[in-house]
Amino acid sequence: MQHGAAHLHYCLPRLLTLWLDFTENIEDFVKKKGKSMTLAATIENASKVIDRFLSSHWRSLIPDYFFLTALPQLVSRLCHPHAKSFTILSSILTSLLSGPHSQQTFWHMVAVSKNRNQVRSSRCLKMFEEAKKVSKQMRKTLEDSITFASMIDDLCDKVKTEKGTKSISLQEHMRSLPALVNRSDGIILPNQRNLLVTLPTGNTDLQQHQPFPSGLVYIQSIDDEVAVMTSLVQPKKITFLGSDGRRYSFLAKPKDDLRRDSRLMDYSCLLNKLFKKDFKSRSRNLHIRTYCVIPTNETSGLIEWANNLKAIRPIIYQLHKDEGRYINVKWTKQYESPEGASLEVKRKNLLQCLEDLRGPVFSNWFTNNFTDPQSWFIARYIIITIIIIISISIIRMAFVRSTAVMSMMGYIIGLGDRHLENINVDTTTGDTFHVDMNCLFNKGETLAVPEVVPFRLTNNMVDAFGPVGVEGPFR
């Protein structure tokens, strides 16, 4: 790590794990009866050597921004029982909080400051206080950020709306939020651009490298109108004006533990790095679409809004409607099997449903949405047709490959609840985009109606793969 970042994602997590795991259990091991005094003394001395080395050398060995890549791992160890190791851990986090990457560190720690575990939250708050002592500007920035996060919590949990409400005004429901945003100039947008570190390549000077080369985007103002989503918990879509003049939207979601989603995004980002390292996956542009998830407490938080997305279910419903078949809750109810029905009855109802649907229709969406017949001219008919075929093929290929990647990843982590409202498609690139990933580690197998398939591969999904189905790029 002293000589470059090529192996940072392998080395740093392992170094931290070995160090913190070793010192976490050392006192119990030393005190355990039946152990050789010589062995116990050797282990204790080894711990002291490690702690002494880290406490005096970590700043000079690697730059601070390297630790931004391992922030979730560092923050998860705030309850570390070994006093000396925690002192070093605390110094690393406090240094990040009070340095040039203060805001990035804050967004990773804000939820921990409100944790129900008193030791964890008190230690986090103490680090905040230590960072505030650096300068008046640092104090103001951190205090504004803490207040901003608390207001987001209030917007999620305390601002109630009537069923059917499509939007609310912040001036009517939470005037203090736009007032804070207008008077503060140091709160960065919690999106991937601001939080995802760009590591140096080649012979770049590690200390001089800029980990955020595009520059940071700060919150300038917030739109008064807040859209209210129609789902059960009624999350709210808020839009900020960034310091670069662009608008950025986020979903303020209540009554949901977003810490799992946040860790899953970290996992997805790591997989993307592995895909880029491998020639075959890189040439196929294999990747997972990611977005920023910031828990602001244990039950709510902010989710970066992704544009140009459309859930697959309404797409398929509209395609059936265009062919004269109207699918709604009442229509699907007639095919539901009663509780305790035999497998034969369930099979019969399913086959009847599929027969009435008259086959899959999802492939029609690609043909309908990635052509422009009005631009056709008779003299250019052949050329335009070829261009359209190529365009559809590229979009379809992106859909197939992104579906394959998400199917593999979902199988590995036991991802369930993959109904067509949770699978979106990008209307500009064709990529699949999965949301609401709370059903993890094969939890779907424990539901009242167990999920017995590893990923979604229904007839409509296969239909969108093209003539070769699963035997082509998907496999």
Predicted regions span which residues?
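Eukaryotic alpha-helical scaffold "rod" segments
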Residues: 2-62, 185-206, 342-360
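C-terminal catalytic region of ATP-dependent kinase domains
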Residues: 22-26, 33-39, 51-120, 126, ...
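Catalytic-loop signature of eukaryotic-like protein kinases
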Residues: 417, 421-424
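Intrinsic disorder
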Residues: 6, 44, 61, 65-68, ...
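Hydrophobic two-helix hairpin corresponding to the core of helix-turn-helix DNA-binding domains
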Residues: 47, 71, 85-86, 93-96, ...
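Conserved ATP-binding subdomain of kinase catalytic cores across diverse folds
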Residues: 198-398, 402-415, 428-433, 438-443
